[in-house]
């Protein structure tokens, strides 16, 4: 069954804290792997040798000595093939840029970051993970790992993790094909001339794609400020549909469907969030997780069952969403039927801009038909050669950023660094 297939691809993990070495997460191959009794992170690593486990630095950018990462304890190899660049705590690429650390554990600083570790000459893959504290693994916007594997078996996924064929993303499934002299992300290769190929497919309009070399931008490819509607009648687009907002404390239960009256629905990507707080809350002994589901999908419609809560503040989103991959004529309609209400817009309207609707009235829950994104705005392809070695070992990585703030790294959000040994 589909459920058993998903179970077969799961790995068990747990977290350990350390003021001296920084927090780490263990990811075990064996589902019955025991908790390791240890006195320090270094003791943990020693006791874990010989076992199929990855020990990964977590929320790295905090101050050293206060659960920020201590690069002096990094050991390259199969036990720590990758490090975490992004999680719900924020972005640890550097001490600049998007997603600063806002947790009460303190600010983001330079010595714990990814770029600091790369400048020390360390070699590692880059990933992201949610650290979601309300029982919702993969919560949208809190971080996810991408894996380049030949199949979705546990062994193939594990081997791809071990060989650093991974990348990081904040939320959207931004696909990055990054090659250097035919090597893939995470590989170490030799050569003076470097053929660089990058192909990025986003879920929304791309802001820019950077190729980073030794901490500096080697090349930047910019996306459009405003997507341009393509010529012709039939268009391939991605349209994000958001559900949420409102002022009330109670959850809104969304039941209904999204459908097309013309054209074809190629796919539906979930953007489902867990609760935007640590659970259980003070005074509570348990917390009920509201599970969001894509109930069904065919080439014309998708049925959804979702729960949204009000946004806890003006900078933290709690909406639920899906992204529709559609191919349809401009006069074709995208129809939303939820909780007894029906709203519809043509693709032509959505190519001009977004449209929103309150379900009951002002300050009630709402549906947002986001601007339709044609292929030209969410795809970037670039080829170049770099013939100037700068160090004994130069490092490269790619980062992609969408205009909606989503990243991946190999960086978009964040892209995995591919490292070249000269």
Predicted features, each with a name:
Residues 1-414:
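Extended, charged catalytic domains and RNA/DNA-binding interfaces, predominantly
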Residues 415-422:
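A short, hydrophobic C-terminal helix/tail in secreted or cell-surface proteins
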């Amino acid at each position: 069954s589909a459920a058993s297939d998903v179970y077969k691809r799961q790995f068990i993990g747990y977290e350990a804290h350390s003021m001296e070495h920084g927090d780490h997460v263990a990811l075990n191959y064996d589902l019955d792997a025991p908790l390791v009794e240890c006195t320090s992170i270094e003791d943990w690593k020693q006791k874990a040798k010989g076992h199929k486990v990855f020990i990964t630095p977590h929320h790295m950018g905090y101050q050293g000595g206060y659960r920020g990462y201590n690069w002096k304890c990094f050991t390259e190899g199969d036990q720590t093939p990758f490090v975490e660049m992004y999680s719900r705590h924020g972005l640890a690429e550097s001490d600049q840029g998007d997603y600063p650390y806002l947790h009460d554990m303190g600010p983001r600083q330079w010595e714990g970051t990814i770029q600091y570790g790369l400048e020390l000459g360390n070699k590692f893959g880059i990933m992201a993970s949610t650290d979601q504290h309300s029982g919702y693994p993969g919560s949208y916007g809190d971080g996810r790992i991408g894996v380049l594997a030949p199949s979705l078996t546990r062994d193939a996924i594990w081997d791809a993790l071990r060989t650093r064929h991974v990348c990081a993303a904040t939320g959207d499934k931004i696909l990055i094909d990054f090659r250097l002299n035919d090597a893939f992300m995470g590989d170490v290769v030799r050569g003076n001339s470097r053929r660089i190929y990058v192909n990025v497919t986003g879920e929304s309009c791309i802001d820019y794609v950077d190729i980073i070399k030794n901490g500096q931008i080697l090349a930047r490819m910019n996306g459009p400020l405003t997507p341009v509607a393509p010529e012709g009648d039939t268009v391939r687009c991605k349209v994000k549909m958001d559900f949420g907002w409102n002022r009330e404390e109670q959850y809104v239960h969304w039941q209904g469907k999204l459908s097309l009256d013309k054209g074809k629905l190629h796919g539906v990507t979930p953007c489902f969030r867990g609760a935007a707080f640590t659970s259980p809350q003070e005074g509570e002994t348990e917390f009920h997780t509201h599970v969001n589901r894509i109930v069904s999908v065919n080439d014309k419609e998708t049925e959804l069952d979702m729960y949204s809560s009000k946004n806890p503040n003006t900078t933290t989103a709690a909406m639920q969403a899906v992204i529709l991959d559609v191919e349809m004529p401009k006069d074709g309609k995208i129809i939303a039927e939820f909780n007894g209400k029906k709203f519809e817009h043509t693709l032509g309207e959505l190519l001009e801009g977004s449209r929103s609707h309150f379900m009951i009235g002002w300050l009630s829950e709402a549906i947002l038909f986001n601007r339709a994104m044609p292929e030209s705005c969410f795809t970037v392809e670039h080829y170049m050669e770099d013939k100037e070695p700068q160090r004994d070992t130069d490092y490269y990585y790619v980062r992609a950023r969408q205009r909606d703030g989503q990243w991946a790294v190999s960086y978009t959000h964040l892209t995995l660094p591919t490292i070249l040994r000269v």
